[in-house]
Amino acid sequence: MTSIIYVGMDVHTTNFTFCCYTADSDRGFAVAQTEPDYRQVIKYMECVQKQRGEECKFVCGYEAGCLGYSLYHQLTRCGVDCVILAPSTMHQEKGKRIKTDRRDAENIARRLAF
């Protein structure tokens, strides 16, 4: 059976931060930070699939911002399912006001899963 893994990406011009999430888990996993290059996204997904040891379908997403559609187009040309989320859809939990790239990536992955 193929697992669906949601990859939240907090993207900036200086770096990308990734976090994976599955619909049956309550916590993100495989957090990583890389240089800002779409090939790093593909490499990251290959590493996650290898670690899991099973066939995986990935759905990636990032919040609309400075990169616009460029990352989206690069990933979809490579066959990667990618979604751009509007900032207004990003729910902030009360009490978690400290923003970090890791938290943002996990939040994006969670939004993709649900």
Predicted features along the sequence, with ranges:
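Phosphate- and other anionic-substrate recognition elements at nucleic-acid/protein interfaces
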Residues: 1-114
